[in-house]
Amino acid sequence: MAPNLRKSHPLLKMINNSLIDLPTPSNISAWWNFGSLLGICLTTQILTGLLLAAHYTADTTLAFSSVAHTCRNVQHGWLIRNLHANGASFFFICIYMHVGRGLYYGSYLYKETWNTGVILLLTLMATAFVGYVLPWGQMSFWGATVITNLFSAIPYIGQTIVEWAWGGFSVDNPTLTRFFTLHFLLPFMIMGLTLIHLTFLHESGSNNPLGIVSNCDKIPFHPYFSLKDILGFMLMFLPLMTLALFSPNLLGDPENFAPANPLVTPPHIKPEWYFLFAYAILRSIPNKLGGVLALAASMLVLFLAPLLHKSKQRTMTFRPLSQLLFWTLTANLLILTWVGSQPVEHPFMIIGQLASLTYFTILLILFPLTGALENKMLNY
């Protein structure tokens, strides 16, 4: 019998082992769809981004008008831009769901996969931040100024780092050109990290909703999960296209319709919606360095997830107390997101401070305590 090419060819063999003959737990739910959705998001963003980069000019005098030119004069330029801008929002929705799934089902116990995933999240956040600066609107400019300026809180070397990052004494042309360079480079870095992430995942195989070893009950990825993933793609592309075609500016900031002006500060500087929770944590501490540390900690705390797992059970499927905490954390993040979009005044300040405190308390204290308590209740 002739050898099967997809199983013997050096390149096809890798694809086959990752996407076709991959042994997959038979009981993984729709929460396991977000990995492939993130892959399709990344591909879409890179394709639309390349098309936009072909018409973009990374110069302070031309950036704003080059984006307007793309939308007005380039064939379907408006659609490409709207897909790229709103595609970023869907990218973040998917990654937050993906991380949430990992926390709920104890996927973080695959330490290498989890750690590369957290690095991917941080890289994605950096990419989105530098990308937001490129249209050179008011919020782009002031967002860049405020966030890069946070590095000046680092003792002794802070100011030097900021001026080095800016390429001058304020956000200006050198800043824009290097941000464009970074925004072009980072997605390819994300692609590389994704391959590392998948390599580590395929070492252990997927987790499943029961959190038990599923080697005795695995099915091939294709056709079962390839079909399920395609359904996921369609269910994501439908709202993305709806948003991009019917209300493309719904999630954007109206300030960004005005070209960047260093002499006029917008009344309320705020990032895109997907960074608002972190922005609320940053603002909730009335000290610059403290705020920066809290902001960093809000993301880096994810690295500690494997160390804070005290339960004998892997997932939260049969742990009602931990479930209650998990959904409280979810609600808390939504509150932080809302507070981040509000002005810095009473009562939003105190709500933000309480929500920030709750965020860290749940993750660092209550999750491990509850895990230990549930062990006790089950006489483990």
From Swiss-Prot:
Gene Ontology biological process: mitochondrial electron transport, ubiquinol to cytochrome c
Key words, A-Z: Electron transport, Heme, Iron, Membrane, Metal-binding, Mitochondrion, Mitochondrion inner membrane, Respiratory chain, Transmembrane, Transmembrane helix, Transport, Ubiquinone
InterPro entries tied to this protein: Cyt_b/b6_C, Cyt_b/b6_C_sf, Cyt_b/b6_N, Cytb/b6-like_sf, Cytochrome_b, Cytochrome_b_C_euk/bac, Cytochrome_b_N_euk/bac, Di-haem_cyt_TM
Gene3D superfamilies assigned to the protein according to its UniProt record, in alphabetical order: Cytochrome Bc1 Complex, Chain C
Cross-referenced SUPFAM superfamilies: a domain/subunit of cytochrome bc1 complex (Ubiquinol-cytochrome c reductase) (SSF81648), Transmembrane di-heme cytochromes (SSF81342)
Subcellular location: Mitochondrion inner membrane
Record: residues binding a ubiquinone: 202
Superkingdom, natural source: Eukaryota
Co-factor(s): heme b
Cofactor: how bound: Binds 2 heme b groups non-covalently.
Similarity comment: Belongs to the cytochrome b family.
Name the UniProt record assigns to this protein: Cytochrome b
Provenance organism: Balearica pavonina (Black crowned-crane)
Upper lineage: Eukaryota, Metazoa, Chordata, Craniata, Vertebrata
